[in-house]
Design a protein with these regions (language model features):
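The feature captures the ABC ATPase H-loop/switch
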Residues: 191-192
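Short, glycine/polar-rich helix-capping loops at beta-to-alpha or helix-loop-helix junctions
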Residues: 195-196
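P-loop NTPase motor domains
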Residues: 2-183, 187
Length: 196
């Protein structure tokens, strides 16, 4: 579930601001295009994100965690035409044939070793999958930090994360955050020039 968030998600007072930033990256990846998200698009998405997390933040139990479909529904309630356009772009991932991430998380993330294999996702979902996996690992880093534990993160085929502008930018940002929060990220690639 790309909407998963724990209350330690950010060291700021509001974990929602950082989660909203992630959802903006996700929407930018989904919508694509040269210009990416316009300022009005970002405002509409941010407002919808704040609205869908309201119940969860008031009573943070797993059953109240929003899913992508909740964001889609909230976007459809917004008056701006941009909201309808963004919702239309998300529809494929909510009720269309690529709806694999529109469900509650069914992976046990508290195990000592967790392996995310995105090989079978296919071309259309791979970039989105890479972004969501990094966010899930960030959730784990924040939980482990609160428990005074380090989190080791090994990224094989790291060059794939650097191919797309959105996943590359998020990878650099999250790498820095991981280190600051006691994470130990390790990138693995077959050719060092991929990183230069």
């Amino acid at each position: 579930n790309p909407m998963d968030m724990n209350l330690n998600y950010s060291e700021d007072d509001s974990p929602l601001a950082l989660k909203s930033d992630f959802i903006l990256s996700l929407c930018e990846l989904v919508i694509g295009g040269k210009e990416g998200l316009q300022p009005v698009d970002k405002t509409v998405i941010d407002r919808a994100v704040r609205n869908v997390y309201r119940d969860y933040l008031a009573d943070p139990v797993p059953e109240k965690m929003p899913i992508l479909g909740d964001l889609y529904d909230e976007l459809l309630k917004q008056p701006e035409p941009e909201a309808a356009r963004i919702a239309a772009a998300l529809e494929l991932y909510v009720s269309g044939s690529l709806n694999v991430f529109n469900h509650r998380t069914n992976v046990e993330l508290s195990n000592r070793l967790v392996c995310f294999d995105i090989k079978q996702l296919g071309k259309q979902l791979k970039k989105l999958g890479m972004l969501i996996v990094q966010d899930q690992i960030w959730n784990r880093v924040t939980i482990n930090r609160a428990e005074k534990k380090s989190t080791r993160y090994y990224m094989d085929e790291f060059h794939l994360l650097l191919k797309e502008e959105q996943t590359a930018a998020y990878s650099v940002e999250i790498w820095k955050r991981f280190r600051k929060w006691g994470g130990i990220p390790t990138a693995i690639t077959q050719n060092i020039k991929d990183l230069l």
